[in-house]
């Protein structure tokens, strides 16, 4: 499974099954987070003029990284691979402090949803306790937070590697794309989440779903054909996500809401996402293009940056360089000009050993800056050796050598830190 581990972004291994009728108890012994975290939320001072949405609208202000966690399943997880808690891998305060020390000022928590994935769709108190602890540690490290739900009613983490064969197909949960009860429960999960965290000073965004993927489930990757066949059906994210937004706004009118498009939130699917009449929306995308370059595995590192290869699956070789990236990312400018919307990149990256990865990152982040986009790198892993030894393709702290699994000074990290050094604002500036 090492190949799986190293090649997937936003998609790490795991099953997250909740037995029917179980509402998990909030028992400290089941927390995935090593150490204790404060339970009291920092809130904005009365009369504070801090507007969370302003962090998304005035040029690039948030530069940081994603964390990744899923529910632990002993059926598929070996020994202490993800730790012995309910969710893993386990993060500590030192992990968040380390992210902040390198200059990041925000973390996108790519986290299991806090309602169960199987019916009855009810609050999962252990998932909620874990999210509380993660937010608390981010706050202690002076980091802004975006909550991004990977899973929830009718969807588990296996959806991100649905065609792999290391788990039983019966454990794959994807009925959220064809069952109204699951979709309504996802709406209620977000209503509950917004009511719980709306006054939290460091929570500056709700990301409704990590990488909507009905296109793969329905096996239709052509944009226009997908919407011709499935537009305005129960499988259409455009039909469903506004219900989530409306539910959030019933209890929280202020916190920015992030939403990505179909196709695993790839940028070329964003123009097909319906724009809502909500003044505090952020339209987000994940940027791993060209995928055949950013996700190569040794020894087959045939594509370089800059380089010449088929980058758009049309059978013709393309010159892939900064101009290619700028042209692809010009979709952002087109959408901004057309709709006047706010956008962000809440996942991006390249596997650390790709030829030319340093130059690729410099060019890509430079374009993000020119476009005024906030951006979160994939991924900031915890210091958990059983995990780090097997899953480290996106761990920039390990440098370009694929066999290295220890932190080492390297140019890849230097480039990232150089961009993070541009951060000027932190939660403590407003409290």
Label each residue range with its predicted role:
Residues 7-9:
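C-terminal motif of bacterial Sec signal peptides marking the signal peptidase cleavage site
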Residues 38-256, 261-269, 280, 380-384, ...:
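Active-site mouth of glycoside hydrolases
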Residues 11-19:
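Bacterial lipoprotein signal-peptidase II cleavage site
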Residues 244, 255-328, 333-335, 340-342:
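Aromatic-lined glycan-binding groove of carbohydrate-active enzymes
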Residues 321-400:
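Substrate-binding cleft of secreted/luminal carbohydrate-active enzymes
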Residues 18-36:
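Post-signal peptide N-terminal segment of mature Sec-exported envelope proteins
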Residues 118-121, 177-179, 224-233, 305-321, ...:
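Surface-exposed cleft-lining segments at the edges of enzyme active sites
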């Amino acid at each position: 499974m090492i190949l799986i581990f190293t090649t997937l972004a936003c998609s790490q291994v795991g099953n997250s099954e909740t037995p029917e009728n179980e509402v998990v108890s909030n028992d400290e012994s089941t927390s995935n987070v090593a150490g204790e975290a404060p339970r009291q939320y920092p809130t904005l001072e009365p009369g504070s003029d801090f507007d969370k949405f302003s962090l998304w609208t005035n040029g690039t202000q948030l530069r940081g990284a994603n964390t990744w966690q899923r529910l632990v399943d002993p059926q598929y997880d070996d020994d202490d691979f993800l730790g012995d808690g309910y969710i893993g891998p386990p993060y500590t305060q030192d992990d968040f402090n380390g992210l902040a020390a390198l200059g990041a000022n925000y973390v996108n928590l790519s986290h299991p949803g806090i309602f169960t994935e199987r019916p009855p769709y009810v609050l999962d108190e252990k998932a909620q306790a874990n999210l509380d602890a993660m937010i608390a540690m981010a706050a202690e490290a002076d980091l802004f937070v975006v909550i991004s739900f990977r899973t929830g009613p009718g969807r588990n983490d296996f959806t991100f590697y649905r065609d792999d064969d290391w788990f039983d197909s019966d454990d794959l949960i994807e009925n959220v794309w064809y069952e109204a009860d699951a979709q309504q429960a996802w709406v209620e999960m977000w209503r509950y989440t917004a009511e719980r965290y709306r006054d939290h000073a460091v929570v500056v965004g709700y990301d409704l779903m990590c990488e909507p993927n009905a296109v793969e489930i329905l096996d239709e990757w052509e944009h226009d054909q997908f919407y011709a066949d499935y537009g305005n059906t129960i499988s259409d994210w455009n039909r469903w996500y506004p219900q989530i937004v409306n539910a959030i706004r019933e209890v929280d009118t202020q916190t920015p809401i992030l939403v990505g498009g179909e196709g695993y939130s790839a940028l070329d699917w964003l123009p097909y996402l319906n724009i809502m009449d909500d003044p505090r929306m952020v339209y987000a995308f994940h940027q791993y293009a060209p995928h055949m370059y950013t996700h190569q595995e040794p020894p087959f590192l045939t594509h370089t940056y800059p380089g010449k290869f088929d980058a758009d699956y049309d059978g013709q070789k393309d010159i892939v360089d900064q101009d290619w990236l700028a042209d692809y990312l010009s979709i952002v400018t087109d959408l901004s000009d057309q709709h006047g919307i706010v956008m962000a990149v809440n996942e991006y990256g390249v596997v650390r050993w790709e030829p030319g990865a340093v130059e690729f990152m410099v060019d890509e982040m430079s374009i993000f800056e020119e476009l005024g986009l906030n951006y979160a790198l994939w991924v900031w892993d915890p210091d958990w050796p059983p995990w780090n030894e097997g899953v480290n393709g996106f761990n920039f702290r390990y440098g370009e050598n694929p066999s290295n699994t220890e932190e080492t000074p390297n140019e890849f990290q230097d480039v990232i830190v150089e961009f993070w050094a541009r951060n000027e604002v932190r939660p403590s500036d407003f409290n």
